[in-house]
Every structure is written in C-alpha cells, then in structure tokens.
From Swiss-Prot:
Subunit structure: Part of the 30S ribosomal subunit. Contacts proteins S5 and S12.
Keywords, alphabetical: Ribonucleoprotein, Ribosomal protein, RNA-binding, rRNA-binding
GO biological process, one term: translation
Protein name: Small ribosomal subunit protein uS8
Organism: Clostridium kluyveri (strain ATCC 8527 / DSM 555 / NBRC 12016 / NCIMB 10680 / K1)
GO molecular function, one term: rRNA binding
Keyword Cell membrane tagged: no
One Gene Ontology term, aspect cellular component: ribonucleoprotein complex
Amino acid sequence: MVMTDPIADLLTRIRNANVVRHEVVEVPSSTIKKAVLNIMLQEGYIKNLEEYADGSVNMIRLSMKYGKNKERVITGLKRISKPGLRVYCRKEEIPKVLNGLGVAIISTSKGIVTDREARKLGVGGEVLCYIW
C-alpha cells in the first residue's frame, strides 16, 4: 500500500494515541518524519525518540508525554499543507499558532524549523502543520 501523505499519517497516529492515552507510538521512519519529531521533542510535546530496525523497515518509537493525572500535553495537531493543496508563506506571513502558544512547523531552505526559528532566520517556506 502506497502512502500518499506520510506526515498526515504521523500526525494521525500521534493524535489517536493521545486520545486513548497510549504511552508509546511506532511509526515508519523517514527523514522528514524524524525532523518533525525532533522539533516536537525540542518543544516538549513528546518524551523521547528511539529509532530501530524491524526486519527491513526502519521504525521510530516515540514516547508520548502526559502531565499529572494523565492530562494531555498535545491539545491539537493539524496538517496544513497537503499533497493536493500546498500552502506556502513568505517570511512576512509566517503564522502564529494560538498567539504563540502553539508551534507551526515549516519546511524552509534552511531545513525543517519552527515558526519562531523561521522568523529569526528570515525565511519562509511550506507550512507543514500546527501543534498546540
């Protein structure tokens, strides 16, 4: 089965695990998924990442992060730029998620970065997703 949107698949797996409060999520590995997950790790939305080989397929195991009494750290995830409708922004148009409380992940010429880093670098790019 061919996956047309691996980032949407990643976000959906995380969203579903978050709803039922799973501790661990496993996703097939790719360079762009690793970059998105590293940003989520730096921003404090997930606990840790572990890459491993499952036969011929490389996988990523990520540990979900919850607060006291299993409160969700991730309130929402939204895919913005999709294969059928790409969404780009110039450096002046970089979105703020919930007035800066959330994070926009943007694919730029300098790599995959958060909205704050893109503003600091002075670059625009493709808006991959919002996390809050």
